[in-house]
Amino acid sequence: MKMPSAEVPTIDVSPLFGDDAQEKVRVGQEINKACRGSGFFYAANHGVDVQRLQDVVNEFHRTMSPQEKYDLAIHAYNKNNSHVRNGYYMAIEGKKAVESFCYLNPSFSEDHPEIKAGTPMHEVNSWPDEEKHPSFRPFCEEYYWTMHRLSKVLMRGFALALGKDERFFEPELKEADTLSSVSLIRYPYLEDYPPVKTGPDGEKLSFEDHFDVSMITVLYQTQVQNLQVETVDGWRDLPTSDTDFLVNAGTYLGHLTNDYFPSPLHRVKFVNAERLSLPFFFHAGQHTLIEPFFPDGAPEGKQGNEAVRYGDYLNHGLHSLIVKNGQT
């Protein structure tokens, strides 16, 4: 039975790139309404070439050999690899169909202070063989910074939505230190699909209910409906778009706003279809510390959240997600 759809507006975010203050405020108002509603909106007129993105990712998944995947696999799949974030997340025959490649900040080199200090969640990216996949790494690094810039622009809209100056968040969103990540996730079509989990309502699931541990999440996906969000009326399907980015507040933004912008609880329903899911998890840096606030004024007698260093928050949140939902 088809589930009703949640209300997910499409917002033209192009004014956030410009100088028209009135139009920017209007975009902020639309973001406010979306985040106080279903928690999701589609960002249109974002300026990203999503067809090229699809082409590169499809080619990558098509040409990677099993040995290449294993050589790049994170520690959970390859004990010889110390990486726990950057690397390949393997499909396991008969158990798990989804596979993905995750990469981090291209600025994380051996000379980066956090790499030299061995700070958790900071890893120098490992890449597929550049002779076999010559255009993959250059594209990925370019795409990372494209998405980081887009996310910073979107944060101007979030700042305006919260009654702040549009540049409120920018001092804390430095390129050199961002913990942001890209995941290139492939869900295959299979004749004999591995067992999948079932939600309490009987829905078959590829990934159970969860909150995104991020500042915001900016997702591109191909045109196969799969996401559901929990609303006051129960679970609802999220509409799809293969031209726009699906945006939602992460739990850190919820923490900062004392849940004025709560991170939406969502899940991935099982669909046996070939599709891509390509989230950009936008993060601040390890040492970022922003004081939480009440956008609509502090309720009488209510204590606000305490400031938490971003790296500590993310490390704890990602660990908790794996404990609850399992290794992706």
Swiss-Prot record:
Cofactor(s) listed in the protein's UniProt record: Fe cation; L-ascorbate
Family, as annotated: Belongs to the iron/ascorbate-dependent oxidoreductase family.
Residues that, per the record, bind 2-oxoglutarate: 275
Record domain Fe2OG dioxygenase: where: 178-284
Residues binding N-[(5S)-5-amino-5-carboxypentanoyl]-L-cysteinyl-D-valine, per UniProt: 85, 89, 181, 187, 210, 212, 277
Domain of life according to the entry: Bacteria
GO biological process, alphabetically ordered: antibiotic biosynthetic process
Gene3D superfamilies from the UniProt entry: B-lactam Antibiotic, Isopenicillin N Synthase, Chain
Sequence positions that bind Fe(2+): 210, 212, 266
Biological role: Removes, in the presence of oxygen, 4 hydrogen atoms from delta-L-(alpha-aminoadipyl)-L-cysteinyl-D-valine (ACV) to form the azetidinone and thiazolidine rings of isopenicillin.
One term of GO molecular function: L-ascorbic acid binding
Pathway: Antibiotic biosynthesis; penicillin G biosynthesis; penicillin G from L-alpha-aminoadipate and L-cysteine and L-valine: step 2/3
Catalyzed chemical reaction(s): N-[(5S)-5-amino-5-carboxypentanoyl]-L-cysteinyl-D-valine + O2 = isopenicillin N + 2 H2O
Name this polypeptide is given: Isopenicillin N synthase
